[in-house]
Amino acid sequence: MFVTPAFAQASGSVVGPDMLMSILPFILIFVIMYFLIIRPQRTQMKKRQEMLNSVRRGDTVVTGGGIVGKVLKVVDDNELELEIADGVRIRVVRATLMDVRVKGEPVADNKNK
């Protein structure tokens, strides 16, 4: 008996400022997330990529596994040859480098001799 009048009432449509006010918190959360998380992560990734691209012969580097070595030669765009002890050479993938500890002096090529 009492249910019939409730169904007979017209529902209010959500148009106008009420709709904007319901979406505004989600927009604000996304903007805050962009400036606190996404943007700093992009700059950090850009710095890391620049560091990886600037590795050259003579640099002392640390790999992801904690191996410290000196770059003997750049094999190609993705691989480096490191000397981790006297006479011990290993090849590593450039992306596994975590840090460049000491930037070495630029080594002159032997082509001029």
Curated annotation (Swiss-Prot):
Keywords: Cell inner membrane, Cell membrane, Membrane, Protein transport, Translocation, Transmembrane, Transmembrane helix, Transport. One of its GO terms (biological process) is protein transport. Coiled coil: none annotated. It is found in: Cell inner membrane. It is a single-pass membrane protein. This is Sec translocon accessory complex subunit YajC. Part of the SecDF-YidC-YajC translocase complex. The SecDF-YidC-YajC translocase forms a supercomplex with SecYEG, called the holo-translocon (HTL). GO terms for cellular component: plasma membrane. The gene is yajC. The SecYEG-SecDF-YajC-YidC holo-translocon (HTL) protein secretase/insertase is a supercomplex required for protein secretion, insertion of proteins into membranes, and assembly of membrane protein complexes. While the SecYEG complex is essential for assembly of a number of proteins and complexes, the SecDF-YajC-YidC subcomplex facilitates these functions. It comes from the Bacteria. Belongs to the YajC family. The chain crosses the membrane at residues 18-38. InterPro entries: Preprotein_translocase_YajC. It comes from Brucella abortus (strain 2308).
